[in-house]
C-alpha cells in the first residue's frame, strides 16, 4: 500500500510540474502569428510566426538589413527603429546605441526577439538590397594570407553599389580542412612554419559576414573581395579558425556563392578637399575601390595620395595597377612602407609602420592637414594609431572616415 501511495504521490508531483511548465510556456512564449508593420506601408508589412529574431524575420521576407557580424550583436549595423512592441532594450545593444537613440526607439534587429505585434521604421535604401547566387570566377592568393575572390553576377543582373560599399556573403554549414587549401609554393613556407594546414573549420549552421568590395562601379558584372585568412592566434591555437574566411579560402572556380547587398557608409565626400588614403592588409579592398573610382570613373582632379603598409614585398599586391594610375594621373601618388623587409626584397623605400611614415614624410610638413579628408582601412592597431596621429594634428572627426570591415 505504501509503495502504491508513493508512486501515486510522485506521479502527481510530476503532473503538477508539467502543468506549471505548460502554463508558463503559454504565458511567456507566443506561438501564434504576429504582424510587423513596416514604414506604415501595407505593401511592405507582413505576418510571421512569433519567437524569431527580427533580423531573421526581415530576411525571410526579402528585406536584408546589414549585419556584418551575421547577427551576433557585435557590429551594431542592423539598426532599426521600433515604434511599438519589441520590449525593453537589452544590455547587448547599449554598447552600440546611446540613450538618445534608445529613447527614439533605435534597436538592433538581431537582438529583438519578436513576441508581439511590431511597428518598425527602416531606411528606404534597404528595399534596394537584393540577394544573388554568384559563381566563383577565380580565388587566387595575392599575398601569403590574402586571397582575391572574384565572383560573377548572374547574367542580366546588376549590383548598384558605390565605391567603398560592401556585400554580405553566406557560408553554409561545412567541415573544411586547411590541408585542402590551394596555396601556391611561394607562400607555403609561412604556412608550414606556423603549421596552419592542421586546422579545420567545422560549422553546423549558415553564417553571414560582410566584406568590402575591391572593384569599383565601372567594373561591372563582378564582385571582387580581398579576404585574409583568420587563423587562431599563435598563443591560443585551440581557438576555432574564422568561419567565413575558411569557407572563402576553400572556394574554387565554378562554385556557387550566395551574397546580398549592396550596403555601405564608407563613401567619399563630394568636395574638392585633398584625399589621403591609408591602408594595410586586406584593407586594400576599399582603398582600391575608392581610388579607381575617383580617377577612372569620376576623372577627379582632387589631390589624392595613397599610403599602404605591408610586412614585406611578398605581401604587396596591385602594384602594377597603382603604378599605372600614378603614371596616368598627375594628381595621384602612392607610397608603400614595409615593416619587415626581407633581404631578398632589396628594398630601398620607406620602412616602418605606415602611420609613422605618413607623418614624418608628408603630414608633419603639410600646410593644413586638418583640411584634408582621410580614408582608412586596415588592421585594428593600424586604425587606432592613425586616428591618434590625426587627432594630434588637429583633424576633426568629420574628416576621418574609417572602414572597419576590410582589415
UniProtKB/Swiss-Prot annotation:
UniProt KW Cytoplasm keyword: no
The enzyme's E.C. designation: 7.2.1.1
Keywords: 2Fe-2S, Cell inner membrane, Cell membrane, FAD, Flavoprotein, Ion transport, Iron, Iron-sulfur, Membrane, Metal-binding, NAD, Sodium, Sodium transport, Translocase, Transmembrane, Transmembrane helix, Transport, Ubiquinone
Swiss-Prot/TrEMBL GO biological process terms: sodium ion transport
rRNA processing keyword on record: no
Cited InterPro entries: 2Fe-2S_ferredoxin-like_sf, 2Fe-2S_ferredoxin-type, Beta-grasp_dom_sf, Cbr1-like_FAD-bd_dom, FAD-bd_FR_type, Flavoprot_Pyr_Nucl_cyt_Rdtase, FNR_nucleotide-bd, NqrF
Subcellular location(s) of the protein: Cell inner membrane
Transmembrane segments: 3-23
Native source species: Serratia proteamaculans (strain 568)
CDD domains the record matches: NADH_quinone_reductase
Positions of [2Fe-2S] cluster binding: 69, 75, 78, 110
GO molecular function (one): 2 iron, 2 sulfur cluster binding
Identification of the protein by name: Na(+)-translocating NADH-quinone reductase subunit F
Subunit structure: Composed of six subunits; NqrA, NqrB, NqrC, NqrD, NqrE and NqrF.
Amino acid at each position: 500500500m505504501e509503495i502504491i501511495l508513493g508512486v501515486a504521490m510522485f506521479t502527481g508531483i510530476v503532473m503538477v510540474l508539467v502543468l506549471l511548465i505548460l502554463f508558463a510556456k503559454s504565458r511567456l512564449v507566443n506561438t501564434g502569428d504576429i504582424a510587423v508593420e513596416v514604414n506604415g506601408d501595407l505593401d511592405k508589412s507582413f505576418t510571421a510566426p512569433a519567437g524569431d529574431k527580427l533580423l531573421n524575420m526581415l530576411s525571410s521576407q526579402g528585406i536584408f538589413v546589414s549585419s556584418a557580424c551575421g547577427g551576433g550583436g557585435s557590429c551594431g549595423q542592423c539598426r532599426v527603429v521600433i515604434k511599438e512592441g519589441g520590449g525593453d532594450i537589452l544590455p547587448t545593444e547599449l554598447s552600440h546605441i546611446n540613450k538618445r537613440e534608445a529613447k527614439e526607439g533605435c534597436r538592433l534587429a538581431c537582438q529583438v526577439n519578436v513576441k508581439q505585434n511590431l511597428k518598425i521604421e527602416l531606411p528606404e535604401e534597404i528595399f534596394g538590397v537584393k540577394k544573388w547566387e554568384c559563381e566563383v570566377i577565380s580565388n587566387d592568393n595575392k599575398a601569403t594570407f590574402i586571397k582575391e575572390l572574384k565572383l560573377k553576377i548572374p547574367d542580366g543582373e546588376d549590383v548598384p553599389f558605390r565605391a567603398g560599399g560592401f556585400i554580405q556573403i553566406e557560408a553554409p554549414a561545412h567541415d573544411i580542412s586547411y590541408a585542402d587549401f590551394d596555396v601556391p609554393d611561394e607562400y607555403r613556407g609561412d604556412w608550414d612554419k606556423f603549421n596552419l594546414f592542421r586546422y579545420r573549420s567545422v560549422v553546423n549552421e549558415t553564417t553571414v559576414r560582410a566584406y568590402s568590395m575591391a572593384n569599383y562601379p565601372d567594373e561591372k558584372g563582378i564582385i571582387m573581395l580581398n579576404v585574409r585568412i583568420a587563423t587562431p592566434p599563435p598563443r591560443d591555437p585551440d581557438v576555432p579558425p574564422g568561419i567565413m574566411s575558411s569557407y572563402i579560402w576553400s572556394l574554387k572556380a565554378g562554385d556557387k556563392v550566395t551574397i546580398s547587398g549592396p550596403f555601405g557608409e564608407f563613401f567619399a565626400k563630394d568636395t574638392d578637399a585633398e584625399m589621403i588614403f591609408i591602408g594595410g592588409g586586406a584593407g586594400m579592398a576599399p582603398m582600391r575601390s575608392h581610388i579607381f573610382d575617383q580617377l577612372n570613373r569620376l576623372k577627379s582632379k582632387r589631390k589624392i595620395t595613397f599610403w599602404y603598409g605591408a610586412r614585406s614585398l611578398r605581401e604587396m599586391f596591385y602594384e602594377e595597377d597603382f603604378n599605372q594610375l600614378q603614371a596616368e594621373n598627375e594628381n595621384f601618388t602612392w607610397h608603400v612602407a614595409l615593416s619587415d623587409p626581407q633581404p631578398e626584397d632589396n628594398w630601398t623605400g620607406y620602412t616602418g609602420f605606415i602611420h609613422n611614415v605618413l607623418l614624418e614624410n608628408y603630414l608633419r610638413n603639410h600646410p593644413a592637414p586638418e583640411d584634408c579628408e582621410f580614408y582608412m582601412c586596415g588592421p585594428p592597431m593600424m586604425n587606432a594609431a592613425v586616428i591618434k596621429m590625426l587627432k594630434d594634428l588637429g583633424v576633426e572627426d568629420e574628416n576621418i572616415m574609417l572602414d572597419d570591415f576590410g582589415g
